[in-house]
Every structure is written in C-alpha cells, then in structure tokens.
Design a protein with these regions (language model features):
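Alpha/propeptide regions of enzymes that mature by internal proteolysis
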Residues: 1-210
Length: 210
C-alpha cells in the first residue's frame, strides 16, 4: 500500500503460460506502476482490479472531473478451482479494501492467506510465500523482497532441504492421471534505484528461483 499516489518504476516478465495480468500494456510502454499490486484467483481479477482502483480514487482523488487517481492497477491470478468454489465469485470489493487497509510493514502473513488461500503446490496445500535479502552496493544497503503465489508442481518433483521426498511418498499419488500444468506468480520489490529496463531483468531472473 503506497503512502502517496506517486507511481514507481516497474517491470515484468512472462516465463510461460497464459495467466491473466492487468496493466501489462502500461508497464510495457511506460515502465511505471501505481498503487497496490493484487494477487487473486482466476475469476476474481476483475473485481480486485476495480476495487484497487476505487480505493485509490477514494484515497487520492482530487474531485477534478478529469481525475486519473484510479490508475491502471496491476492484478495477477492463479487458478484455485480444485480447493475453492471459484465459480461462486466469493471475493468482493470489501475483501480487497480490508486487505489493503490491513497491510503493514515487517513480517508478512504466509501460507493459507489472501490469494494463496485456495492454491496447491506439489499436490499439497500451497499458498503465499516470501523471501528477502539485504545487499550492499557502493557502501549502501538495499533490500530485495520476493513474494510468491504458488500453485504448481507434481509430487515426484518435490524436494525439501535437498531431499527428493516426493519420490519416496508415491502412495499419496492421486488415482486419476496427475495434472501436469500449474502456475505461479512472483512479485519482486526493492528499494534499490533501478530503472524499468533493469527491473525487467530482475523479473526475468526470478524464473531461476523457480
């Protein structure tokens, strides 16, 4: 959640797949983002985008008839229809407002929260995960933080602490043919003074982490 309406440098990279993500044309042409970034399920992209825009307008709107406080919100999705009644369209604007207004600095809630609530990972319960590092460049320290919404993976590929545990628990394999596809969203944030083109490269490097 931004403390001001100021936009920020931004980039993106699509590694594979056909997931929906709003705001890409603006990121591509201008290399700028504005307002909160939303992560949700496939069927809730529209309501989350509209709610973020409404939140920005109410918080930063000037009252001018030509007011662009709405911005062009960035919202991405993964499909959670296996665990969630996705066609019930249960995510409402109020849920988005609550999430934005409840955002705080410091440690983040992980696992079964937010957009990650209905997600799967390596046939187990997936969700939201984070990681961060501080780096020093030219005598100055910067933070690089990563948040993922994980919804992918097949059991036999599950590795924990270097141990291929997925190959040892094959009795948990489903009876039906295993689903081969999946999805993941990676959001990287930093206070380092990077340009949009550099941030595109940062986004591309996130695929190595996957």
């Amino acid at each position: 959640r931004g403390k001001t309406q100021d936009s920020y440098n931004a980039g993106y990279f699509i590694f594979n797949g056909d997931g929906e993500m709003t705001g890409i044309p603006y990121l591509h042409d201008y290399g700028r983002g504005s307002g909160p970034i939303g992560l949700t399920n496939t069927n809730s992209v529209g309501v989350v985008r509209d709610a973020i825009g409404e939140w920005q307008f109410k918080k930063f709107g000037s009252g001018n008839p030509i007011d662009f406080s709405f911005g062009l919100p960035t919202v991405a999705e993964t499909w959670d229809g296996f665990l969630n009644d996705i066609n019930g369209y249960h995510v409402k604007k109020g849920d988005v407002f609550e999430a934005i207004d409840g955002a705080v600095s410091g440690s983040l809630a992980e696992g079964n929260v937010g957009g990650g609530t209905g997600m799967m990972c390596y046939y187990f319960k997936g969700g939201t995960g984070t990681s961060s590092r501080t780096v020093e460049v030219g005598g100055k320290k910067y933070t690089v933080g990563v948040l993922v919404q994980a919804n992918f993976g097949i059991l036999r590929d599950l590795v924990i602490a270097g141990v291929p545990v997925g190959k040892e628990i094959t009795d948990l394999e489903p009876v039906e043919k295993p689903q081969q596809d999946g999805s993941i969203i990676v959001v990287v944030g930093t206070d380092a003074p990077l340009s949009p083109s550099q941030l595109n490269l940062v986004a591309k490097r996130a695929t190595l982490g996957i």
